[in-house]
Amino acid sequence: MVSNQIATPTDPAVLVTGVTKPDSSAILNVDESVGNGKETVTTEWGFPRSKGQSLSYWLQQVRDDELLDHRTTEELPEAADTVIIGSGITGTLVAKYHKQNWPDKSVVVVEARDFCSGATGRNAGHCKPDQWRGFGKYEKQFGSEQAMKILQNEQDTWEALVAYIREHNVDCDLWVGDTLDVPMDAETASLAKDVFERYRAAGGKVDHIKMTSDPEEAARITRLQEAKACYAWPASTLQPRKLTAHIMRVNLAAGVNLQTFTPARSVTPYEDDTKAEGKGERYRWTVHTDRGSIACTDVVHASNAYLPAYEPSLRGLIRPKPHMCNKVIPPLAFAGSRALRHSYGVLLRDGSLFSINPRHGADGVVMFGGSNPGQRKLDEVGRRTAGGGPAVRRRRALFGEGKEGRRRRRWYGGGAAGYGRGAEVC
């Protein structure tokens, strides 16, 4: 089932023209598969649905969690030093580091629906640092030096994530092992090799990446018969909602105020000249919600695809795109001793990519995400229930068919990711 998570706005859809994405000769990334090269974007915006949204696999597992509808105080605070809009991993981490650096400053997190029910609660749980694949695109946009820094930041972020989970013994189904990038046709394999070699020639670290260019060996390693090459390096999978909940509980203990089911509708300059009580500085903003308004000094926008709904200046710069993630229960051919032992990035033509996350050490199901070859079609059917089509056929190619295969397919819904000019907005 495909379920659009963006409600139709009160006003007619806003059409935005003249927004382009940077072109690139190295199309190996998810964000480029939704529109290659320069294009005019026509999009609409909207607030999160108040009802009728799908319940993702991650959210199904935490229905008894008291954070779901948590409100730290019965009434919405009238003022705060900082208001964070959105309680996904971005908003939750911002609150964490805010309290670590400024423990005396007040923080209020407002969430339109239940806690962590947006993109973080709907993704595939694949924590995969880009080690080389984005180099061609970033080099063209920002130059070689900055491209290297972007990729190093991905690695640093992943290492910090794993270290935090292990240090604090976070119950979030963490698995660490090799992830496989697998080009599935000769053209994509050639492009992947070119980008990889350019990255290495520029001084990129590749000692930890195991490259296999022989198609027969790649097919053996990956168990994908059409594989033309394989690139392997360490990555992770996890249950993202559980991780976010752990961090938010730490935040609450540190004094963060969480207000769920409190959609922000607009942010306006603060109009009163009254100084912030006891702070010696003026408020700068007012966050307007369905439950009242909060005066504050700073606002952090962590609402992903929904941001343009309440911040009109960003309409066209951040655009919502529907994405779909599926849960599959593996048949016997991919269960037990024959279960998939790696996560995957299956690279297809035109930048399409399947992200495959086998839940090692958890319930053993396999999560499929990414940006499939039918992504443009998904844009068209995002407002109605649709069958699997090409996605189902690809699943059959991997897992086989028969009664067991048909019985064990499970769709678990979709969500909306926010895309900026060539980069995903967290």
Say what each PLM segment does:
Residues 2-82, 100-101, 105-106:
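Extreme N-terminal leader/targeting segments of oxidoreductases
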Residues 86, 130, 289, 296, ...:
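Short, well-ordered coil/turn residues at beta-beta hairpins
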Residues 86-92, 112:
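Glycine-rich Rossmann-fold phosphate-binding loop(s) that bind the pyrophosphate
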Residues 99-122:
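Glycine-rich FAD pyrophosphate-binding loop
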Residues 112, 167-175, 293-425:
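Active-site substrate-recognition segment that forms the wall
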Residues 124-145:
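N-terminal glycine-rich dinucleotide-binding loop that anchors FAD/FMN and/or NAD(P) in oxidoreductases
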Residues 138-250:
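Rossmann-like flavin
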Residues 198-202, 224-297:
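Helical element adjacent to the flavin cofactor pocket in flavoenzyme catalytic cores
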